[in-house]
Amino acid sequence: MTMESGAENQQSGDAAVTEAENQQMTVQAQPQIATLAQVSMPAAHATSSAPTVTLVQLPNGQTVQVHGVIQAAQPSVIQSPQVQTVQISTIAESEDSQESVDSVTDSQKRREILSRRPSYRKILNDLSSDAPGVPRIEEEKSEEETSAPAITTVTVPTPIYQTSSGQYIAITQGGAIQLANNGTDGVQGLQTLTMTNAAATQPGTTILQYAQTTDGQQILVPSNQVVVQAASGDVQTYQIRTAPTSTIAPGVVMASSPALPTQPAEEAARKREVRLMKNREAARECRRKKKEYVKCLENRVAVLENQNKTLIEELKALKDLYCHKSD
């Protein structure tokens, strides 16, 4: 019992000493703890972890376990402003996409406005709608509308030709030839001259056909000639030349009179004759002047030769005279 009580007294004494030392260490460490507490304030919001245990050796040689007040540095919970940067870049991309969509919409609207403008063919049709006998040009349609073939009706006017004598010749589609004098008004009072149509023949053959006048007379003429009887009773023959189908469209007939040349050809021939006549006159005058000049030169040479002979004779006479005086 005595040993047990002694041990208890010793343990109680050691405990009292330990408590006193702990109090002294606590008093000495208060400024540091306060400082550490001040330093560790920003990390108060960090996640809780187990406190670190530090072994402290006292001056009397005892070792005490002290719970560390300074906590380990925790990873910062402050997020970097990358999220905001990503947000800004996303907004910029969305604005670019919106601008591209707007540009595509504007280009589509511009194409629609251009497609609504009237084409040149439509303007030409509007201008030529009032002119009689002018075929209308169908406006180009889209591919959807061109599925069905469009048929255009073209009205071909009756060709009317005027000869150099003042007569009018109208050739209808049926093959009839109508004649009118210069005094008639328009197409009224035309004399109809019907010609029988000949069948297709080989090239190089001559076809004769009957031409019936208004008074009932029939005249046998070649197929490429037309006989015209004027009001005065004169009968004139006109030759009709048909050009090949490759150069002129079918239905176009060229009428010409071999006996009466056209006015431009006569004017050109007259000008050519005048030019040739002037050239001949100029050449004749040039030759005449050349002959006169040659004659003038020949006369001058003859005069100079005579003068030279005279001077030679005078020189001889002077020499003879000088020789006699010296003797």
Curated annotation (Swiss-Prot):
Region (Basic motif): 270-295
The encoding gene: CREB1
GO CC terms of this entry: ATF4-CREB1 transcription factor complex; axon; centrosome; chromatin; ciliary basal body; cytosol; euchromatin; mitochondrial matrix
Cross-linked sites for Glycyl lysine isopeptide (Lys-Gly) (interchain with G-Cter in SUMO1): 271, 290
Leucine-zipper: annotated segments: 297-318
Protein name per UniProt: Cyclic AMP-responsive element-binding protein 1
Alphabetically ordered keywords of this record: Activator, Biological rhythms, Chromosomal rearrangement, Differentiation, DNA-binding, Host-virus interaction, Isopeptide bond, Nucleus, Phosphoprotein, Transcription, Transcription regulation, Ubl conjugation
GO process terms (BP): axonogenesis; cAMP/PKA signal transduction; cellular response to fatty acid; cellular response to forskolin; cellular response to hepatocyte growth factor stimulus; cellular response to insulin-like growth factor stimulus; cellular response to leukemia inhibitory factor; cellular response to nerve growth factor stimulus
InterPro entries: bZIP, bZIP_sf, CREB1-like_pKID, Leuzip_CREB
Pathological condition linked to this protein in its record: Angiomatoid fibrous histiocytoma: A distinct variant of malignant fibrous histiocytoma that typically occurs in children and adolescents and is manifest by nodular subcutaneous growth. Characteristic microscopic features include lobulated sheets of histiocyte-like cells intimately associated with areas of hemorrhage and cystic pseudovascular spaces, as well as a striking cuffing of inflammatory cells, mimicking a lymph node metastasis. A CREB1 mutation has been found in a patient with multiple congenital anomalies consisting of agenesis of the corpus callosum, cerebellar hypoplasia, severe neonatal respiratory distress refractory to surfactant, thymus hypoplasia, and thyroid follicular hypoplasia.
Oligomer and partners: Interacts with PPRC1. Binds DNA as a dimer. This dimer is stabilized by magnesium ions. Interacts, through the bZIP domain, with the coactivators CRTC1/TORC1, CRTC2/TORC2 and CRTC3/TORC3. When phosphorylated on Ser-119, binds CREBBP. Interacts with CREBL2; regulates CREB1 phosphorylation, stability and transcriptional activity. Interacts (phosphorylated form) with TOX3. Interacts with ARRB1. Binds to HIPK2. Interacts with SGK1. Interacts with TSSK4; this interaction facilitates phosphorylation on Ser-119. Forms a complex with KMT2A and CREBBP.
Xref: Gene3D superfamilies: 1.20.5.170
Cross-link (Glycyl lysine isopeptide (Lys-Gly) (interchain with G-Cter in SUMO2)): 122
Subcellular location, principal: nucleus
Coiled-coil features, chain-numbered ranges: none
Mod. after translation: Stimulated by phosphorylation. Phosphorylation of both Ser-119 and Ser-128 in the SCN regulates the activity of CREB and participates in circadian rhythm generation. Phosphorylation of Ser-119 allows CREBBP binding. In liver, phosphorylation is induced by fasting or glucagon in a circadian fashion. CREBL2 positively regulates phosphorylation at Ser-119 thereby stimulating CREB1 transcriptional activity. Phosphorylated upon calcium influx by CaMK4 and CaMK2 on Ser-119. CaMK4 is much more potent than CaMK2 in activating CREB. Phosphorylated by CaMK2 on Ser-128.
Residue ranges of every copy of the bZIP domain listed in the record: 269-327
UniProt function note: Phosphorylation-dependent transcription factor that stimulates transcription upon binding to the DNA cAMP response element (CRE), a sequence present in many viral and cellular promoters. Transcription activation is enhanced by the TORC coactivators which act independently of Ser-119 phosphorylation. Involved in different cellular processes including the synchronization of circadian rhythmicity and the differentiation of adipose cells. Regulates the expression of apoptotic and inflammatory response factors in cardiomyocytes in response to ERFE-mediated activation of AKT signaling.
Effect of residue 141 to R: No effect on sumoylation
Effect of residue 271 to R: Decreased sumoylation, in vivo and in vitro
Record bears the keyword Nucleus: yes
Species of provenance: Homo sapiens (Human)
